[in-house]
Swiss-Prot record:
Domain Rhodanese: residue ranges: 18-106
Molecular function as annotated in GO: thiosulfate-cyanide sulfurtransferase activity
Protein name as annotated: Thiosulfate sulfurtransferase GlpE
Physiological role: Transferase that catalyzes the transfer of sulfur from thiosulfate to thiophilic acceptors such as cyanide or dithiols. May function in a CysM-independent thiosulfate assimilation pathway by catalyzing the conversion of thiosulfate to sulfite, which can then be used for L-cysteine biosynthesis.
UniProt catalytic activity: thiosulfate + hydrogen cyanide = thiocyanate + sulfite + 2 H(+); thiosulfate + [thioredoxin]-dithiol = [thioredoxin]-disulfide + hydrogen sulfide + sulfite + 2 H(+)
Family: Belongs to the GlpE family.
A single GO BP: glycerol metabolic process
Source organism of this protein record: Haemophilus ducreyi (strain 35000HP / ATCC 700724)
Amino acid sequence: MAAIFTEISPTTAWQLVKHENAFLADIRALAHYLDDHPSGAFHLTNDSYAEFLDLVSDEQAVIVVCYHGISSRSVAQFLVEQGFETVYSVTGGFEAWQKLALPVTKGCDQ
């Protein structure tokens, strides 16, 4: 059976970040990331992938967030294929995150 990622709600994602040390990766365009992003999120791009690999530990779950929860699925599946064991995609993306009034940060916090 092929490994797959799991879709989770923004609330569950935030709980995993806060209480389980999950690694949150925002894959939206830089301009949108800088406008605001989930608090603590790393801006993951092709260019920052090597840094991502240095930062994330083998034990950490990785949570991927995009605009609406669509693009994050393909990135989550890519990470599973790269050997990450616990990978999640945020259902509804950053739009849903904002609607739930979960914590956001403006600017760059990397």
